[in-house]
Amino acid sequence: MNRFFESLINLFFPPKCPFCGKILDTVGICPKCERSLPWVPEEEVAFTEKDLTCAAPLWYEGAVREALLRLKFRGGSALAEPFGELLARCAAERFGGEFDTVTWVPVSQKRLEARGYDQSRLLAEAVCRHWDTRPVQLLNKVQDNPAQSG
């Protein structure tokens, strides 16, 4: 998006901190929330199985949990940008920052129609904007599984 349109959008819909709602100059997290978030220490890995290692920037609790639930279930699609930045930074710091492909696990057609967006795809796109690349759709949802949370 060019800077003019981005500035125009920010004039009418200014970026807000996803945790406290404070209006910001740019998309991101306010300094107060940045300091108080439940960060996962770099030396802690969330999951390791054979050659697969997963990591997360934040623990899923409190304000983080609430913001992610807004993103997923309550029309908070704008939250994908700040969370995408966090994911991009975490992956670059913990895994070296060079990746062959970024993809996502899509939602079912039923959930896509109900929400109006695929939060996983939005997160993948936001991560890729920080790495100047594009996500690649590698997976298709063939079955509508029961919701894991809500």
Q: Which residues fall in each region the model found?
A:
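Glycine-rich phosphate/pyrophosphate-handling loop used in enzymes and phosphotransfer proteins
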Residues: M1-G150
